[in-house]
Every structure is written in structure tokens, then in C-alpha cells.
């Protein structure tokens, strides 16, 4: 495993561990998801450069577009829950009561 692959894998795993262990606030969960998506984007962009093919060059842009949609949806949910519940703590959110 090259140092570049190790750094991107460790960045993804750190984001995943942050998502698993620090799930107290919705904002911290969204930041961990964004870190995971950023590491995937950089790894996919380097993978497309490595193969030097035009077919692989659209995949990072597609991932970036989905990441932007995910971020906007997450922020909209964060604003909606902060307005209705008064906090962004994930323990206070119950799908049966919403």
C-alpha cells in the first residue's frame, strides 16, 4: 500500500469512526460525512488520473455533485430540527414523534 493510498484510507476510516463514536450532535455527524465524501472524491480523482481515460474522469464530478446535494439536504434537516426541537442533539430526535 502506497503512502497516498494509506492517507486516503485513513482519512475515510477516521471519518467513519467519528461518525460512529461522536454521534451526539447532528452537525458533527454531517461534518464526518463530509470528510468521508472529501476523501472519496480525492481518491477517485487520483484514480481517474492514474488510468488516464476520459470515461473515469466524470466519476469524481458526479460524486462531488452528490456530495453537494447531500450537504444541502443535511443543512436543511439541521435547520428544520433546530427550529422544531430547539437543539441538534441526535438523542432528542425520535422518528415516531416527528
From Swiss-Prot:
**Keywords, sorted A to Z:** Electron transport, Membrane, Mitochondrion, NAD, Respiratory chain, Translocase, Transmembrane, Transmembrane helix, Transport, Ubiquinone
GO aspect biological process, one term = ATP synthesis coupled electron transport
Q: Please name one Pfam family that this protein belongs to.
A: Oxidored_q2
- Gene3D superfamilies listed in its UniProt record: 1.10.287.3510
Q: Where in the cell is it found?
A: Mitochondrion membrane
Per the record, the domain of life is Eukaryota
Q: Tell me the leader sequence span.
A: none
The main enzyme category here is translocase
Q: Do you know which InterPro entries this protein is assigned to?
A: NADH_UbQ_OxRdtase_chain4L/K, NUOK/Mnh_C1-like
Q: Please give the GO cellular component terms listed in this UniProt entry.
A: mitochondrial membrane; respiratory chain complex I
What chemistry does it catalyse, as a reaction equation? a ubiquinone + NADH + 5 H(+)(in) = a ubiquinol + NAD(+) + 4 H(+)(out)
Primary location group: mitochondrion
GO MF term set: NADH dehydrogenase (ubiquinone) activity
Its annotated function is as follows:
Core subunit of the mitochondrial membrane respiratory chain NADH dehydrogenase (Complex I) which catalyzes electron transfer from NADH through the respiratory chain, using ubiquinone as an electron acceptor. Part of the enzyme membrane arm which is embedded in the lipid bilayer and involved in proton translocation.
**Family recorded in the similarity comment:** Belongs to the complex I subunit 4L family.
Q: What is this protein called?
A: NADH-ubiquinone oxidoreductase chain 4L
Name its species: Carassius auratus (Goldfish)
Lineage of origin: Eukaryota, Metazoa, Chordata, Craniata, Vertebrata
